[in-house]
From Swiss-Prot:
Protein name (database record): ATP synthase subunit delta, chloroplastic
Keywords associated with the record: ATP synthesis, CF(1), Chloroplast, Hydrogen ion transport, Ion transport, Membrane, Plastid, Thylakoid, Transport
Keyword Plastid recorded: yes
Transmembrane region(s): none
Quaternary structure, from the entry: F-type ATPases have 2 components, F(1) - the catalytic core - and F(0) - the membrane proton channel. F(1) has five subunits: alpha(3), beta(3), gamma(1), delta(1), epsilon(1). CF(0) has four main subunits: a(1), b(1), b'(1) and c(10-14). The alpha and beta chains form an alternating ring which encloses part of the gamma chain. F(1) is attached to F(0) by a central stalk formed by the gamma and epsilon chains, while a peripheral stalk is formed by the delta, b and b' chains.
Topology relative to the membrane: Peripheral membrane protein
GO molecular function: proton-transporting ATP synthase activity, rotational mechanism
Functional summary from the UniProt entry: F(1)F(0) ATP synthase produces ATP from ADP in the presence of a proton or sodium gradient. F-type ATPases consist of two structural domains, F(1) containing the extramembraneous catalytic core and F(0) containing the membrane proton channel, linked together by a central stalk and a peripheral stalk. During catalysis, ATP synthesis in the catalytic domain of F(1) is coupled via a rotary mechanism of the central stalk subunits to proton translocation.
InterPro entries per the UniProt record, alphabetical: ATP_synth_OSCP/delta_N_sf, ATPase_OSCP/d_CS, ATPase_OSCP/dsu
Length: 186
C-alpha cells in the first residue's frame, strides 16, 4: 500500500467525524469554508505545513501556532477539531483531512469537484463548457472547478475528478509516445 493510500485511509475517519459534527451543528457550509481556507493557507505556506508535520515541535507549540494562524479566521468548531488533531498527532495530515472533508461535504450536496490544470488561463465560456461536459459525464447536479495554470503542460489540460484523471495535455501525449517507443524498442 502506498503512503498516499495509507494517509488517505487514516484521514477518512477524521473527515467523516468532522462532517458528522458539521451536520449536527448545522454548520456544513461554515466548516467547508474553513477547510477551504485551511487548504489554501497550507498550500501557500510550506513552512507552516512543515512545522505542523515536525515531530520535534511540542503539542503546545503547534496549538499556539494554529490558534495564532487560524484563530480569528475559522469557527470555534473547526478550531476545536484542529486541536483534537494536534492531541492525536494527526495534524500533519491536515491538508488530506481537509480535502477528504470537502469531498464528503460536496458529495452530500451532490457537488462534484473537478481539479483542472491548464497551460493557459480559461475564459468564462470555456469554464462553462467544461462544467456542462463534466455534469454530463458524472451526472452531478453541481460542478465546482478548481483551476490551476501549469505552463509545463505545453498545451491542453488535465482534469481530475476523484481518482479519475483525463489528460489531454501535450506533455501527457509526449509521455505516452515515449512510453510506446520504449516498449517498441524492447
Amino acid at each position: 500500500m502506498s503512503s498516499n493510500n495509507l494517509v488517505a485511509k487514516i484521514a477518512q475517519p477524521y473527515a467523516s467525524a468532522l462532517l458528522d459534527l458539521a451536520n449536527e451543528k448545522k454548520a456544513i457550509e461554515q466548516i467547508s469554508q474553513d477547510m477551504k481556507l485551511i487548504k489554501d493557507i497550507l498550500l501557500q505556506s510550506g513552512k507552516l505545513k512543515y512545522f505542523l508535520a515536525n515531530p520535534l515541535k511540542t503539542i503546545e507549540a503547534k496549538k499556539q501556532v494554529i490558534a495564532a494562524t487560524f484563530g480569528d479566521q475559522i469557527s470555534e468548531n473547526t478550531l476545536s477539531f484542529l486541536m483534537v488533531l494536534v492531541d492525536r498527532k494527526r495534524i500533519s495530515m491536515l491538508d488530506v483531512i481537509a480535502g477528504k472533508y470537502l469531498e464528503l461535504a460536496y458529495a452530500m450536496e451532490s457537488l462534484t469537484i473537478a481539479n483542472i490544470s491548464t497551460s493557459i488561463a480559461l475564459n468564462s465560456d470555456q469554464e462553462n463548457l467544461l462544467i456542462d461536459k463534466i455534469k454530463a459525464m458524472t451526472s452531478a447536479k453541481e460542478v465546482k472547478l478548481v483551476i490551476s495554470v501549469d505552463p509545463e503542460l505545453i498545451g491542453g489540460f488535465t482534469i481530475q475528478i476523484g481518482s479519475k484523471v483525463i489528460d489531454t495535455s501535450i506533455r501527457g501525449q509526449l509521455k505516452q509516445m515515449a512510453s510506446h517507443l520504449d516498449v517498441a524498442a524492447m
